[in-house]
């Protein structure tokens, strides 16, 4: 039998657009999302709004925070949080979802969100190690450049059913954010 890992290996070769609107607005969030067939999206808009509002409340954003959003999909949580954050970095394994996230940021005029393709357990540790090499961190170092990525204020994770990989969890702890919001 096939394992869950096989789901990501299979690509949809050809799709035919039969009938739908090209985009829609998630009620209550003020963000318009375009979604491709290969991308995941929460299908219950009322509960999605409650979920994102709860995540925002737990994140405690004031507009000055740097945020990592792991397993970000098409950027739904990232873009929602970007309205109250200084900078948001999203990571997702599905390339088409990251394309959707970037397009959704443009569509909504959001400039404080960046998105990266890859496994969270590979991308986050890689950024962390590279940032440590690039900038020496001390208590009096101003939060600029790589430091924003190295020492985020908040990390939000909305992982698949299997949960977060141990390497990802270890890196999150090493980054010492003020808050981790696990959706």
Q: How should each PLM-predicted stretch be described?
A:
Residues 2, 6-183:
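Rossmann-like S-adenosyl-L-methionine
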């Amino acid at each position: 039998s096939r394992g869950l890992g096989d789901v990501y290996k299979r690509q949809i070769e050809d799709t035919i657009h039969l009938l739908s609107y090209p985009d829609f607005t998630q009620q209550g969030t003020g963000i318009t999302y375009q979604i491709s067939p290969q991308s995941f999206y929460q299908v219950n808009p009322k509960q999605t709004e409650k979920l994102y509002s709860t995540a925002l409340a737990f994140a405690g954003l004031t507009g000055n925070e740097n945020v990592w959003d792991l397993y970000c999909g098409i950027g739904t949580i990232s873009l929602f949080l970007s309205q109250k954050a200084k900078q948001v970095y999203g990571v997702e394994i599905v390339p088409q979802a990251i394309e959707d996230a970037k397009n959704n940021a443009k569509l909504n005029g959001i400039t404080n969100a960046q998105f990266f393709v890859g496994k969270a357990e590979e991308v986050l540790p890689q950024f962390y190690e590279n940032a440590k090499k690039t900038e020496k961190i001390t208590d009096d170092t101003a939060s600029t450049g790589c430091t924003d990525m190295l020492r985020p204020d908040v990390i939000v994770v909305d992982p698949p059913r299997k949960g977060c990989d141990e390497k990802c969890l270890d890196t999150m702890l090493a980054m010492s954010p003020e808050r981790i919001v696990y959706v």
